[in-house]
Amino acid sequence: FTGAGVSAESGIPTFRDALTGLWAHYDPERLATEAGFRADPALVWRWYADRRAAIGAAQPNPAHRAIAACESRSGSRVTVVTQNIDGLHARAGSRGVLELHGSILRARCLEGCGDPAHVAPGYDWRSDPRVPPPCPRCGAPLRPDVVWFGELLPPDVFARAERAALRCDLMLVVGTSALVHPAAGLPLLAREAGARIVVVNPEPTPIDDLAAGVLRGEAGVLIPAVLDGLPHRVAERGGAAGSEP
């Protein structure tokens, strides 16, 4: 279960840290609410275009790669759930990542007429000079396929994340402040179902007291060390994640 701290190590600023330069004087909620988008869609679209450019220049770091390698060796016994919208887990090789807050690399119709993941097959909305580009199906503006303030998490994605939390034996909570709900409730759900929690974060978090282990430091350093050998313990236990972090 990963958060913004993992992406920060790839040079991607958090939402509020990105409010610098030309964007420093804007109210964050003006740039990340449906009301703000409807009031000034061109402004919000340009903001997300700037963020997409920064993300495109970033690369997965050792934490992303170690998680993908663990998943590759362990198969369906590992589920990657993230609060990040940058797609770096997928670029590192993780498959079926549960993106709780959506993806900045996708767009969807503001009025909800199409499939968010495939809003317009064959249509390269990133190259459309119109700001924002229109939905080719109904003509309404396209919006970033991310969760804005005041919006619900994608119900199907969150339901799958809850099921994974309830079934897991071990949850690594990496690079998240564990303050943004409802996503932050997943470690508690896993703990109540009997899982062991290991927190990897530079700073204290509200769930440290629930954890079987807390590792202070950067994910890019600690996660490769933590996951080295974990797939072998998983295999030795016949498919159950090992009880030792």
Which residues does each predicted region cover?
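Conserved catalytic core of sirtuin-type NAD+-dependent deacylases
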Residues: 1-245
